[in-house]
Amino acid sequence: TRFIIGDEIQYGEFVRSIKILIGKQNPLKLSELKLIELVERHDYRIGIKSNLEPNIKEGIGGLRDIHTILWVSIFMFNIYKLEDLTSINIYTKEEIKELKNAWKFLLTIRAFIHLFNESKGDVLSIENQLKISKKLSYKDKKKEKGVEIFMKDLFVNVAKINSLLRTFYCLLYTSPSPRDMPRS
């Protein structure tokens, strides 16, 4: 969670209560449950029209995958910020930078989806792809339309998130402790 507005004391009490609740759980079991949820969500997304109209939140490499990294980091390591994953050798500083840039890109797209739909939504429709690519100043080139360049950038970003999520789980389950893994 993050404090946006309201009573900071009440927010602090809420965060403390969540930490206590999480602390009482088996971290490995919680991590495994998140992995099962992730696999089921990814299996569902394969083969549907998500490539033409991707779901920015629930799709493979979407916002939910970043949330999974954050939740498991809290369960397993009591780490609440992505950048702190460098301290236990999960990611390099460059990987964190890439992950945060991809996250920001997806959040920007999602905000435009909400704006253009005038409601909550996570599917990047073909109609909104064109609108958002223009808002983000993607220009047509000789051999490629601006919207195509935008969609390529989107797929590069979701592929990066998916790759870093897989790295996260591989290190989590193949190393006695991610802290022991040397990373460049």
Task: Give the location of each predicted region.
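Conserved small/polar residues in nucleotide/adenosyl-binding loops
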Residues: Y173-P182
